[in-house]
């Protein structure tokens, strides 16, 4: 067996598709593009997300989610949460440990009758009490 007898394995080499080279090839005339229409023309490219007239996926699914650009202030009622009164220092991280509020919260407002009494314990500028601006 010499180099001249070597052949690739059966089915490993595909036949090259030469389109528009006569009707005898089976891919002549319309060159496998079908007759007329937008897809038969040169330069045709479907839009991203186009599904052939079917309602596209991004339009079938509902619109979800919105986050306002306004500042996010989280209100905590002091009367309902006695744990805040027991804190020696009120900081943003200590309140986060007590109340599992979302990460995007930028400030906390303490509300209720006893909130003004806690103003001296507050050690963080992101925390305000009711009546305070």
Swiss-Prot record:
GO cellular component: cytosolic large ribosomal subunit
Assigned keywords, A-Z: Ribonucleoprotein, Ribosomal protein, RNA-binding, rRNA-binding
UniProt keyword annotation of Iron present: no
Domain of life: Bacteria
Region feature (Disordered): 1-64
GO MF terms, alphabetically ordered: rRNA binding; structural constituent of ribosome
Single Gene Ontology BP annotation: translation
InterPro entries per the UniProt record, alphabetical: Ribosomal_uL15 (IPR030878), Ribosomal_uL15/eL18_sf (IPR036227), Ribosomal_uL15_bac-type (IPR005749)
HAMAP family: Ribosomal_uL15
Protein's job: Binds to the 23S rRNA.
Oligomeric form and interacting partners: Part of the 50S ribosomal subunit.
Family affiliation: Belongs to the universal ribosomal protein uL15 family.
Protein name: Large ribosomal subunit protein uL15
Native source species: Helicobacter pylori (strain Shi470)
Lineage: Bacteria, Pseudomonadati, Campylobacterota, Epsilonproteobacteria, Campylobacterales
């Amino acid at each position: 067996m010499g180099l001249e007898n070597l052949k690739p394995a059966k089915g490993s080499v595909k036949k090259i598709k030469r389109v528009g080279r006569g009707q005898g090839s089976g891919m002549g005339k319309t060159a496998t593009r079908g007759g007329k229409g937008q897809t038969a023309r040169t330069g045709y490219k479907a839009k991203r997300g186009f599904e052939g007239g079917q309602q596209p996926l991004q339009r079938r699914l509902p619109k979800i989610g919105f986050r306002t650009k306004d500042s996010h202030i989280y209100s905590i009622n002091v009367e309902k949460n006695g744990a805040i009164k027991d804190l020696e220092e009120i900081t943003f991280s200590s309140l986060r440990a007590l109340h599992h509020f979302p990460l995007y919260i930028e400030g906390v407002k303490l509300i209720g009758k006893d909130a003004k009494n806690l103003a001296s314990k507050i050690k963080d500028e992101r925390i305000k009490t009711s009546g305070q601006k």
